């Protein structure tokens, strides 16, 4: 492979990523590589699917700079959210789910009493959700996604949020 492709890739090795992105040959190579290695999960339109992020929006858990994207492609990303169902129990999981929904859903789409109880759980032990998701749910780069927008890797329904809190998530 090195004999066959080494000369082609050498052209881009020391070129700034911004220049590589504008190069027509690099664009063709990139499209071929995306179609070979990425399309299965992220889709032909790169808009993702359940469990696989949309690559066309501005919501990047690991950062959206060219260098951060390069690192993600080169090294991959493994993210784990611990399951909180056993520690919290069903009712407190529902409280936290309603609090999370209060960040991005209009009143009436979540239970305000449960959300008020969920606030205390989100910001305190044992869960301390804010350490990964930020004090106001805005997310912490590389730790936990933004919960205040309408971008949900695993779907933003109450059922899906409860499932995520209860069972955790393992993204690779």
Task: Enumerate the predicted regions with their spans.
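Periplasmic c-type cytochrome electron-transfer domains
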Residues: 1-22, 62-68, 83-101
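Short, flexible helix-adjacent loops and helix caps
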Residues: 17, 46, 60, 105-108, ...
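Sequence/structural segment immediately N-terminal to covalent heme-attachment motifs in c-type
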Residues: 22-44, 71, 110-138, 149, ...
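Membrane-embedded segments
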Residues: 26-68, 74-78
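A general structural signal for well-ordered secondary-structure junctions
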Residues: 61, 78-79, 106, 127-129, ...
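Axial heme c-ligation environment in periplasmic c-type cytochrome domains
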Residues: 50-56, 74-93, 97-111, 142-146, ...
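Short charge-dense sequence patches
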Residues: 15-24, 46-51, 146
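Electron-transfer interface patches adjacent to heme c in soluble/periplasmic c-type cytochromes
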Residues: 58-66, 83-93, 126-128, 146-163
């Amino acid at each position: 492979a090195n004999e066959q492709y080494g000369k082609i890739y050498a052209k881009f090795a020391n070129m700034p990523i911004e220049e590589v992105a504008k190069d027509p040959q690099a664009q063709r190579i990139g499209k071929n590589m995306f179609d070979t290695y990425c399309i299965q999960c992220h889709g032909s339109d790169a808009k993702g699917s359940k469990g696989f992020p949309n690559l066309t929006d501005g919501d990047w858990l690991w950062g959206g700079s060219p260098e951060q994207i390069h690192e993600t492609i080169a090294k991959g990303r493994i993210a784990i959210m611990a399951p909180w169902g056993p520690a919290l129990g069903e009712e407190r999981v529902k409280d936290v789910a309603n609090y999370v929904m209060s960040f991005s859903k209009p009143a009436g789409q979540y239970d305000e009493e449960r959300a008020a109880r969920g606030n205390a759980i989100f910001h305190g032990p044992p869960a301390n959700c804010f350490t990964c998701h930020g004090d106001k749910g805005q997310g912490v780069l590389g730790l936990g996604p933004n919960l205040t927008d309408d971008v949900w890797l695993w779907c933003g329904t109450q059922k899906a949020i409860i499932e995520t809190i209860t069972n955790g998530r393992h993204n690779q």
